[in-house]
Amino acid sequence: MCGIVGLLLKTEPLRERLGELMVPMFTCMAARGSDSGGCAFFGESGDSPWRRFNLYVSDRQYPWQTLLDDFKTEFDGKNGSDVRFQTLENHAVLTAANDPVVVREWFEQRDPKVHLMSVGRNMDVYKDVGDPVEICKRFRFAEATGSHCVGHTRMATESAVTPVHSHPYTAGEDFCLVHNGSLSNPYMLRRRLEREGIRFETDNDTEAACRFIEWRLREGDNLQAALTTAFTQLDGFYTLLMATSNRICLVRDAFACKPAVVAETDEYVAISSEFRSLAHLPGVAQAEIFEPKPEEIYSWRV
Amino acid sequence: MASVNQTVQLDLANQSVREVNQFLHQDFDDGNAHYIEILHPDGNHSIGVGLDADADIDIRGHAGYYVAGMNRQARVTIHGNVGWSVAENIMSGSVRVKGNASQCAAASGHGGLVVIEGDASSRCGISMKGVDIVVGGSVGHLSGFMAQAGRMVICGDADAGLGDSIYEAVIYVAGKIHGLGADARKEPMSAEDVAAVTELLEQAQLQHDPQKFKRIASARTLYHWNADVEQEY
């Protein structure tokens, strides 16, 4: 089992309440996965010149200041970059205009314990091992604002339980994916992608799906084409929930054994593994409620 | 003879599902009519599983997986939506869902009546063995898969793969069928079929024209192995 949740808010006033509305969805689904938890939040879209680099370390007393001072010394002023950062226990968001490849390499050399979890202009990713309810409190999910988010509570059935193995997985920029299920050919996908020069961070099956779909999108496929190819290439059971800076997208495999339920109103689209985690949402009694069909692409724009 | 109503309220906000179920598993066979109300189900799983009681039970809210599984005798109403496998392996009595049901509603049910007033998701009535099912809305893919006995009435549409590998169960559909499964076929409605649909709609208290239903049953071509068919694996 695992739990997945997603929420896309269609109206401006509700976007102030993204965190408040998603927290009960997320904590309810903690019952489906108590190993690890995580969530990707998307702030207001728009073309920010700055990239947001989300960093993770396992040590909650990590001396961020030293690291970030060094980063500033190295990068501030380069490419017109005005480096900013905010930290929250073992998580930091660094805002800068620098090339993600250069930034990643710099962190890897400076301190391998620091993991670059996500890169994007609108996306912040929080994830860790442990009780999802505690993770939700520690990273103050309730205070989040923005247009959409996707979250995951994990009960590992294949690879290890570590922070990098927890969901959401990210690839490229402003792309993330959460998964309930298990793939039977992740190593085949992985070998295929490694030939394209794509680097993996874990041995997890979801990472293969995430990098495969992001690779297709980067190669010029639209979402429809990328996912239609994914249906033929991913073997196994999956409910996949993806997010980009301006949409969320949901698909299930041909058998659709892994659960998903959608509730849509004029104000929001909410997705969860189980209806009970949507029951608190405003106006849910009048929502259009359905379970997505196998191999059908459901996509909602912000 | 049934005497005074014994009304009991159980609140899942204060009691565990196990405590509630242990209460429901007591011997109710005392000649009294029993009415039990369960409050704050909040999507919990396995509420009212294994009932064997001459009792009316109202669950006030949304229930999770397996609600009223293996039911005998009891008449259970869920005033909300339910998760996977509502009334799984029901033996007798009735289970009514006022909202929608997730996958595998009434799976492998042997007897009794299951009514879903809203939509049922995929695999509704999978491997049913004698239960009657009435769905007020539509059903998802692979409903009636390997259904062995019993009747399923679908007032809305049916998704792909309806009645795949069906045995002797019969499915009636009022709406659109988005594809039949292997060995399922459309058959003419007889007077008995119309009478059966009329009776089941009455029991379910749903208003639909019984004449509008189509009959889906087994073509029985999978009953015996046919070595002459070209097999490709």
Model-found features: residue ranges?
Chain A
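Conserved short alpha-helical segments that host acidic/polar catalytic motifs at enzyme active sites
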Residues: 1-302
